[in-house]
Design a protein with these regions (language model features):
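An N-terminal hydrophobic leader/cap segment in hydrolases
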Residues: 8-63, 72
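The serine-hydrolase catalytic nucleophile loop
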Residues: 89-102, 115, 248
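Alpha/beta-hydrolase active-site loop
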Residues: 126-146
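Hydrolase active-site cap/lid region
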Residues: 164-216
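Short alpha-helix in the alpha/beta-hydrolase fold that links the catalytic acid
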Residues: 232, 246-256
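C-terminal catalytic histidine-bearing segment of alpha/beta-hydrolase fold enzymes
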Residues: 259-306
Length: 306
């Protein structure tokens, strides 16, 4: 081997080593930044102690993998169904008190919970994007004890979960998925590109491998494909001005539009952001959006009863 060949080989090996080290380090930094513990958000539009007298609840616990999750059951008299709410990443169950109260007022019992690594639940961190579906699956096992038709409501991280779990064994009457993403890897890839630019594509194989090691087959679940294959009525909502999960990017809405399944209805909400599509800064639920959700749930329950 000539001197030039040896030098070239060393340069290539060094470049490969740098690539491997930087890619692995970048994935670890990303995980640490995104998936640490998520304790109570600093800013809540409504706090439970302010509404406890009007919305009594009981605390429930159940396991999701090795984590013990804490949830709350809000019973409604002569409830027509049980709404299970899956929250977003960095939020917790109490973040969605406006939605919880709305559903109770509409005559539904509601089950909320803090996901793994969040709020009152166990876990050293939230683990990753696929964890939301695993936690919702565990919550549904607890929800089935109430012996009521089950309706799902998920936002963002929970919006993905409310679609992804439809590929499982639980009997779900209908699901509303707001501002969700289609696949964990798709959103991780977009986030990496946002942070690092096009060079982030070099690290995608390591993102994929990390997800496989953490979650196995659960990392590959497409919310859109699971929803389409289930036949369950699904309402997918997304804001046109969502900067967190762009509607025309790795969103559940875009993927569901490609699936074009008859059981899925997609609604793009003009001018709405990642959170404003549900409630405003004062905690008031969007009347127009929740009128659609209420009608959707009522129709699904009527069809199920027929």
């Amino acid at each position: 081997m000539s001197g030039k060949s040896r030098v070239l080989r060393r340069i290539l090996l060094l470049a490969l080593a740098v690539y491997l080290i930087c890619s692995v380090a970048a994935v670890q930094v990303m995980n640490a930044a995104l998936f640490g513990r998520a304790d109570e958000p600093k800013e809540l539009t409504v706090r439970y102690e302010d509404v406890a007298a009007d919305y009594p609840r009981q605390t429930v616990t159940f396991s999701s993998g090795s984590a013990q999750l804490t949830g709350w059951l809000y019973p409604a008299e002569d409830a027509a169904a049980l709404v299970v709410i899956a929250h977003g990443l960095g939020a917790d169950a109490e973040t969605y008190l406006p939605e919880t109260m709305h559903f109770v007022d509409e005559g539904y019992s509601v089950l909320t919970y803090d996901a793994t690594g969040t709020g009152a639940s166990g876990g050293s961190g939230t683990r990753g994007l696929a964890q939301s579906a695993l936690d919702l699956d565990a919550a549904l096992t607890r929800a089935e004890q109430e012996d009521l038709p089950i309706l799902l409501f998920g936002h963002s991280w929970g919006g993905y979960a409310a679609a992804a779990v439809l590929g499982g064994s639980h009997d779900v009457t209908a699901s509303v998925c707001a501002a969700g993403f289609d696949t964990p890897l798709g959103l991780m890839r977009q986030t990496a590109r946002r942070w690092c630019g096009p060079v982030a594509e070099l690290g995608v194989p390591f993102l994929w491998l990390d997800q496989q090691l953490r979650f196995g087959a659960a990392a590959d679940v497409s919310g859109a494909k699971a929803a389409a294959a289930s036949g369950v009525p699904v309402l997918v909502l997304h804001g046109s001005d969502d900067g967190t999960i762009p509607a025309d990017g790795p969103s559940l809405l875009a993927a569901c539009q490609k699936e074009n399944a008859p059981n899925i209805r997609t609604v793009l909400l003009p001018g709405e952001t990642h959170t404003s599509l549900l409630h405003d800064a004062q905690g008031r639920c969007s009347e127009a959006v929740f009128a659609q959700i209420d009608a959707f749930y009522a129709a699904a329950l009527a069809d199920g009863a027929g």
